Amino acid sequence: MDDTGAAPVVIFGGRSQIGGELARRLAAGATMVLAARNADQLADQAAALRAAGAIAVHTREFDADDLAAHGPLVASLVAEHGPIGTAVLAFGILGDQARAETDAAHAVAIVHTDYVAQVSLLTHLAAAMRTAGRGSLVVFSSVAGIRVRRANYVYGSAKAGLDGFASGLADALHGTGVRLLIARPGFVIGRMTEGMTPAPLSVTPERVAAATACALVNGKRVVWIPWALRPMFVALRLLPRFVWRRMPR
C-alpha cells in the first residue's frame, strides 16, 4: 500500500480529454491513478499531473470492455493504494449511428462500452467504497440520454440507461458515506466529435472538467453543463413526439 496517506483519485479512461482535464483539476496533493489501454503510453498524461501538483502518479492497464477484469482491478487498486477516494468513469465511445442502424454488432459494441461496462465497473467500485464507508464516484451521462433523438438513438439510449442506473445507485448509496455525481454535458467539442457541426450550447472538455470539479467539491449530485441545458430539456421533454422526431441532432 502507498505510504503517502492520500486517498487515490482513479481516472478510468485516463487518455480521454475530459478525464485528463478533470484529473489535472484534482491532482494537487493527491495520489493519481490513470487507468487505460496501453498504459505504458501514458507518460505525457502522467507528467501533466505531476506538474499540476500530484504527490504520485501511477498507471494501470484497463480495458473497459473486459468485464471480468473489473473486479480484480478494483481489488488490486485498493490493496496497493488503499481505499479509493474518487473514481472517475471517463471512458466511452460515440460510435457510428448510420452503421449501427444496420450493423447489430456495432450497435451492441456502443451499448456495451457506454452502458454495460459502466454498470459493471460502478457496481465493483460502489461495493468497495461501501466497505470503506467513504468515496466519491463521478459518472459522465449526457443530455443525449435525457430524451433520445432519432439522429443518435443508439448512443443516446446507452446514456439514458447509464443516467437511470447512476441515479438509482446514488439513492442506494445515500447514508453510506459514498457520494455519486452525475455530469450531464451537452455537445462536447473534442476528439470524439471531430468533423461534426457543434450543436447549440456546445462546450469544451476544459469547461466540462471545470464544472464537474466544482460540483464535486460542492457535494452536488447532478451537474448540467452548461446549466442552461436543464431548463431547455424540461421544455424539450414536453414536445409532442411528431415534432421531436423531426428534431436535428
UniProtKB/Swiss-Prot annotation:
Recorded GO MF terms: oxidoreductase activity
List ligand-binding residues for NADP(+).
11-34
- Residues annotated as coiled-coil are none
Residues recorded as binding substrate, renumbered to this chain, are: S142
Task: Please state what class of enzyme this protein is.
Answer: oxidoreductase
| Enzyme Commission code | 1.-.-.-
What PANTHER family does UniProt report for this protein, alphabetically? Answer: 5-KETO-D-GLUCONATE 5-REDUCTASE, DECAPRENYLPHOSPHORYL-2-KETO-BETA-D-ERYTHRO-PENTOSE REDUCTASE
Family indicated by similarity: Belongs to the short-chain dehydrogenases/reductases (SDR) family.
Protein name (database record): Uncharacterized oxidoreductase MT2133
* Source organism of this protein record: Mycobacterium tuberculosis (strain CDC 1551 / Oshkosh)
What is the phylogenetic placement of the source species in the record? Bacteria, Bacillati, Actinomycetota, Actinomycetes, Mycobacteriales
